[in-house]
Structure formats: C-alpha cells, structure tokens
C-alpha cells in the first residue's frame, strides 16, 4: 500500500504536469529488491488513475491497450492480428515472458513457434471473449538497451533498421526503437547517422503516391463508399462493398507507366480488422496480369515491397475476409 501510494503520487505528477500523453508504458520485467522481494503492483489502481487523468493515453505492455509482441530482437509475425482472445493483458503473464536479467541472449530470441499464431480463426474459435490488442515491437539500435562505448561499431545497419521498420510499421505492429543516450547525455553520432539515413530513405521512397492521380474502380461497392475513397489517408472516408461480399478487386489505372516498388494497404480499423488474404497484381505490356505480392493480414497498415515493375495499372485483390473488407487507404510508390 505504501509503495502504491508513492507510485500513484508520482504517476499523478507525470499525468498532470507534462501536457497530453499518447502512451503510458509499463515494462514487463519485474526486478527483485536486494532482499529478493518482488513488488506486487496494484495495476487496477494505476489504470484507473491514468484513465481519469489521461483518458486518451494508450496503456502499453503491462496494460490493457497495447500488447508486447513477445521478443526484443525485432522479430515479427507474418500474420499479425489486433483482435485476440481476452486474457493477453495479464501483467503477471507478461512479466513471466519478459527479460529476467540483463541477458544478451534473451534480446536475440525470436517469437516462439507456439506464439506465431495469436489471432487466426482456429485460435479464436473457442475464446470466451475478444479484445482489440494491437502489438508493439520494441528493440534497440544497439545490442542492448543502454549505451556502451565498446558497442559503437555494433550499431545496426540502415538496411537492418529499414527491414525492421517495414516488418513492424508495415506489418500491423507499432515500433519502439530504443536509442540510448551516451555519457554526454546525447545520442551518439553513429546512431544519429543511421537514423538520418533511415529517414531519408523512407521520405524518398514515399514522396510520390501514384494512386493520388490514378483512376480507381472496384468490381463492386455498397453504393455509399466507393473505391475512390482510398485516395484519402484518413479514417473519415473508406471503401466498402455490401455485407457478405468478402472477395473484391480494386483496379488502379495510372496516369502513365511508372516504376513501382511499394504498395501500402490500410484497413478502416474503426470497423475492426477483417482481411485474411490478398494479392497485388501488375498489368504487363501484353495486357496480362502478373502477381507481384501476396499476403495475409493487413490491419492498420501493410506495406508490400517487391522488385521494381514498370506498369500503368495495378489490382488489389482481396481474396478472403472475415466479413466484407473495408479499406481506408491504398498507396502506390
């Protein structure tokens, strides 16, 4: 009780003196005191205080809103679902799977095979209830979470960081990338250079969206939410077919032939996550269509990367969906 009182006083300060917070992050690790005692936390009290003082803040990891992806290596699932069975917000379960000591081998561990599937129909069929629990992938730009001069030559490469970004931010997960300050209280020059290279690459890649000027059609819609709506990168407008139409095709006729390397898909997640399988096709000069990418889940964002293809038209084929698919955005780059 004394610890919880002290903690809530500090939490009150943090939630009232620093403006609006987008997240309150509780680590899964629970360290022992010098006497071997592990603190027992009054989680419900903490959550209630945050909801009162910062109602828009997402409570992450050991909390009810944002789920830890299950590793610190930057590994991700091929099919990342945000709709899960209830029970994944148990802080004790999160703590049991978290790092128990400063362990380099733990930070290299990938998602276990038994936790690759958390949200498929098979996994959900006997669930007592369901919850919206999007994933956060947390990893470090260096081998560990803190700065060590001896690791200045072990900063992750730009290529590795971009791969992690595409698999997380482009794979229906969020990304927490740890950048530890050095003994000067600054980010080390090598780390900064990697981040600049990463940012420059992403800005260049996504500078021009060919879908903005494309003619967009769908083989069906519900009469109220046309395919044209996927130009807008927001949740105010979206494309939707009639209920029960779980397989649809959207066609994008570009203004002129372009070299295309990326396609971005976003579901209208205010109406949940629905898509289970999709394919991206490019039109060849002879008029035939060739599949250039195929995937499973989409969620808030899925980014497909592929070898450059020159084309003047692309098709997004939703092959299967739990209920009729609802897309808020499609980008072609």
What are these regions (language model features)?
Residues 312-314:
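Exposed beta-strand face motif in extracellular beta-rich ectodomains
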Residues 1-246, 251-252, 259, 264-267, ...:
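Mature catalytic domains of secreted/periplasmic carbohydrate-active enzymes
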Residues 322-333:
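Edge beta-strands of jelly-roll/beta-sandwich modules across compartments, strongly enriched
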Residues 256-258, 284, 309, 320:
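A generic beta-sheet turn/junction motif
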Residues 279-281, 331:
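Beta-strand signatures of extracellular beta-sandwich domains
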């Amino acid at each position: 009780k004394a610890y919880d009182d002290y903690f809530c006083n500090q939490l009150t300060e943090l939630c009232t003196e620093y403006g609006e917070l987008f997240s309150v992050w509780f680590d899964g690790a629970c360290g022992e005191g010098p006497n071997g005692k592990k603190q027992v936390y009054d989680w419900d009290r903490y959550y209630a205080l945050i909801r009162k003082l910062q109602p828009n803040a997402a409570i992450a990891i050991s909390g009810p809103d944002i789920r830890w992806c299950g590793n610190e290596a930057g590994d991700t699932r091929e099919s990342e679902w945000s709709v899960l069975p209830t029970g994944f917000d148990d802080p004790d379960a999160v703590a049991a799977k978290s790092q128990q000591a400063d362990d380099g081998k733990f930070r290299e561990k990938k998602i276990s095979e038994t936790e690759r599937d958390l949200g498929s129909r098979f996994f959900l069929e006997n669930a007592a209830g369901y919850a919206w629990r999007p994933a956060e992938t947390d990893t470090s730009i260096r081998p560990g979470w803190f700065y060590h001069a001896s690791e200045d030559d072990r900063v992750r490469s730009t290529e590795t960081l971009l791969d992690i970004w595409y698999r997380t931010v482009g794979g229906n997960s969020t990304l927490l990338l740890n950048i530890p300050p050095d003994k000067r209280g600054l980010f080390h020059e090598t780390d900064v250079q990697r981040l600049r290279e990463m940012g420059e690459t992403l800005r260049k890649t996504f500078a021009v969206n060919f879908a903005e000027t494309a003619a967009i059609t769908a083989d069906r819609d519900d009469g109220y939410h046309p395919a044209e709506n996927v130009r807008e990168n927001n949740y105010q407008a979206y494309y939707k077919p009639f209920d029960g139409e779980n397989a649809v095709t959207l066609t994008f006729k570009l203004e002129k032939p372009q070299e295309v390397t990326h396609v971005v898909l976003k579901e209208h997640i205010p109406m949940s996550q629905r898509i289970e399988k999709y394919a991206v096709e490019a039109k060849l000069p002879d008029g035939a269509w060739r599949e250039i990418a195929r995937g499973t889940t989409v969620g808030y964002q899925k980014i497909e990367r592929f070898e450059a293809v020159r084309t003047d038209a692309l098709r997004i084929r939703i092959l299967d969906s739990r209920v009729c698919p609802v897309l808020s955005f499609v980008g072609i780059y």
